[in-house]
Amino acid sequence: MARHPELLIPASSLEVLKTAVIFGADAVYIGGEAFGLRAKAKNFSMEDMKEGIAFAHAHDVKVYVTANILAHNEDLPGVRKYFEELREIKPDALIIADPGVFEIAKEVCPEIERHISTQANNTNYGTYNFWYRQGASRVVSARELSLEEIKELRANIPEDLEIETFVHGAMCISYSGRCLLSNYFTGRDANRGACTHPCRWKYAVVEEKRPGEYLPVYENERGTYIFNSKDLCMIQYIPELLEAGIDSLKIEGRMKTALYVATVARTYRKAIDDYQKDPELYKKNVPWYLEQISNCTYRQFTTGFFFGKPDETTQIYDSNTYVKEYTYLGIVGEVKDGLCRIEQRNKFSVGETIEIMKPNGENVEVQVEKIFNEDGEEQESAPHSKQVLYVALSQDAQQYDILRRAEKADETKALCE
């Protein structure tokens, strides 16, 4: 049996961190308010980070903080101050791409482990060994590596140097995520946390001798999403991932909702545990894993580079829209006197049938019986996003349960290929 892997889940906020922890993460990675390459994510204040780390550690879950900016000179003083603050709240590791930032981390907080981000283009065992000699304890493999290449890596690096690999989520069209399109089109630097995702826009080809004549690609007169990748999904290949010697299975998505994080964490948790317990049970349950994971809000799936270089089926040429099966309504907070406190995320009404998604076990269909606002006034619906409400359901819910509503599918979902 292969080694027991870590399940590493993203979190965009304190609420999502707690969701990841409760729904099965072994470790969570988060970003602060600077230097983490997710300027549009909610990110964590130092106070939220401190609370999140304490919550995770109380549940025996680790927390890694991203500092994977490709720094300019002007960034370095702020990086130093940031690491001085992080030293006090004791995350389990820093995720770093820039050698200059790495050196500052070694100097300021040597007791915190240093992981090398995929942004550093980690494609060969020479690179892994270099970072090991510098003091890194883990390297995140480039998304461009195949399983065979990862096996070769494992055989040529120290046993105590960990390999972390993205196994699920969005794929960047650029090499190891180092995109220049956003900076070129909008002046917002993807390598400094401000990507505008131009890979999801439509494009047409122009031949230099025919200015003004826009040539459609794949016969789409409005252009094509030629840079628009499907999402990575490797849940049906857990055995292959573990046999390759991967230590940490990483889920992409530091800008995703709590519903997405709960669904992916719970499903991958069960898949890993099933395989470790009984490989035959895992094989039997693969259709269930795929059904559950496809209920999130995301695109069609691909296996990326794991089994060789992707072909044209990896791209989505006609759309950048998301497949959607469930609408996220909120997370159950305190439960008292039969009322669930929630901060509502999407509209729902009295009399509707919704689902309670639990960390363990089956989902439960319930009726919304009553809705009260913070003043105790009864209302028929929850129309305002982020309104704090107290909701009576036809069956009991527990703190950290997810409330969601099933929607009619607009299209047939494509599962892993």
Give the role of each language-model region:
Residues C109:
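Conserved phosphotransfer cores of two-component systems
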Residues R38-F55:
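Glycine-rich, positively charged N-terminal anion/phosphate-binding segment
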Residues G100-V101:
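Alpha-helix capping/helix-boundary segments
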Residues V65-T66, I96, I116-T118:
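Short beta-strand elements of ligand-binding domains
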Residues M1-A11, V16-I22, A27-I30, A34, ...:
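Surface-exposed amphipathic alpha-helical tracts and adjacent flexible/coil segments at the periphery
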